[in-house]
Amino acid sequence: MTDHNEAKKVLLSPFISNNPIMLQVLGICSALAVTSKMETAFVMALAVTVVTGFSNLFISLIRHIIPNSVRIIVQMTIIASLVIVVDQLLKAFSYELSKQLSVFVGLIITNCIVMGRAEAYAMKSPPWLSFLDGIGNGLGYGFILLLVGTIREVIGSGSWFGITLFETVNNGGWYIPNGMLLMPPSAFFLIGLFIWVLRTLRPEQQEPTEHGHKE
C-alpha cells in the first residue's frame, strides 16, 4: 500500500502541488512559443512527456554504474538520443506539424524539466518511480501548455484544434478574434496569471519574503 501511495504521489503531484511550470517556473520558453495552436501544444506536450519518462527510466537503470564526473554528459546523451527518435517519428508521421514546431522539438534536449528530473530524481530513485516521475512531470507541463493553448486559440482565432467554434467576421460570422492572444507575449501574461491564482489559493507555494515570512 505504501508503494502504491508513493507511486500515486510521484505521478500526480506535478499537476498542481509541484507543477514544473507553475511552481518551479521551468520550461517557459517552449510554453511561450508553441501554444498559439492546440495541435503544436499537444504534440510538444506529448514529446516532452515521452522524453522525460523514458530518459528518467534509462538513467535510473544505469545510475549505479555512471561515474559521477561524467553523469551530466551521460544524461544529455540519453536525452538527446530520445529527442532524435521523437523528432524523426514526428517528421515521418506528421511532417507539417514538424515544420511548425521547427527547432523547439530539438530544444527539448536543453529543457530544464527533463534535465532537472534526471539529475534530481532519476539518479537517486528506482526505475519504476523514476519513470512515473518523468511521466507525471511531462503531463503536468503538458496540462499547462494545453490550458494556455486553449485560451489563446479560442480567443485569438475562434477555433480549437483547428475546428471552428465561433465564426469570425472575416468569414461572415459575429466573432471578432483578439489577435493579441496569438502573439508569444500573451502566453507569458497567461502563465503569470495562472501562477498568481495558484499561489493565492495555495499559500504554501508562496516564496518567503526577504524578511523570512510569507505574506
Swiss-Prot record:
Keywords: Cell inner membrane, Cell membrane, Ion transport, Membrane, NAD, Sodium, Sodium transport, Translocase, Transmembrane, Transmembrane helix, Transport, Ubiquinone. It is found in: Cell inner membrane. It comes from the Bacteria. It catalyses: a ubiquinone + n Na(+)(in) + NADH + H(+) = a ubiquinol + n Na(+)(out) + NAD(+). GO terms for cellular component: plasma membrane. The chain crosses the membrane at residues 14-34, 42-62, 72-92, 103-123, 131-151, 178-198. Coiled coil: none annotated. Pfam families: Rnf-Nqr. The keyword Ion transport applies. One of its GO terms (molecular function) is oxidoreductase activity, acting on NAD(P)H, quinone or similar compound as acceptor. It is a multi-pass membrane protein. Its EC number is 7.2.1.1. One of its GO terms (biological process) is sodium ion transport. Its main location: membrane. HAMAP family: NqrD (MF_00428). NQR complex catalyzes the reduction of ubiquinone-1 to ubiquinol by two successive reactions, coupled with the transport of Na(+) ions from the cytoplasm to the periplasm. NqrA to NqrE are probably involved in the second step, the conversion of ubisemiquinone to ubiquinol. Belongs to the NqrDE/RnfAE family. Composed of six subunits; NqrA, NqrB, NqrC, NqrD, NqrE and NqrF. This is Na(+)-translocating NADH-quinone reductase subunit D. It comes from Tolumonas auensis (strain DSM 9187 / NBRC 110442 / TA 4). The gene is nqrD.
